[in-house]
Amino acid sequence: MARKAYSEEDRVQVRNALMTTMIQCIADRGLIHSSIDVLCRKVGISKTFFYSFFSSKEELVLYALRYQQPKLLDYARSLMEDPGLSWRAGVETFLKNCCYGAKSGVAVLSIEEEQQVRHCLSEENFQAFRRDQIIFYGKLLSIFS
């Protein structure tokens, strides 16, 4: 079987598809039930091609969580700017839809899943992710203030 040649634009689309598919899989089934095989099948690529983007499922999870951050910040902003919602109602809506299990397409890891991801990461990747999370939560708090 001949290999497909991917342009740089194709690679960007595949990478984005992997991240959005991972987010959806985590939101729908949780990380444990989100295998590389399932992701590759949904995106339409081989496992070999997957590994040209990410070294592991856990590395993809980090990138996917970063990838959804702008969407979450925009959502928080829209709630705070909604004249029909009080500050409290806006924050409660955000937490309900994004953190407490509402089926809103947002990837949220359980404590066990976070520990699994942490265990598989290099110290460098973990520290970089931790810095990104601190920045993200700072922006979120700024929106809610």
Specify the residue positions occupied by each region the protein language model found.
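Amphipathic alpha-helical packing segments from all-alpha helical-bundle domains
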Residues: 70-73, 77, 120-145
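Amphipathic alpha-helical segments used for helix-helix packing
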Residues: 89, 101-127
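Helix-turn-helix
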Residues: 25-59, 63
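Hydrophobic alpha-helical connector segments
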Residues: 63, 77-104
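Basic, helix-initiating cap at the start of DNA-binding domains
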Residues: 1-29, 37-38
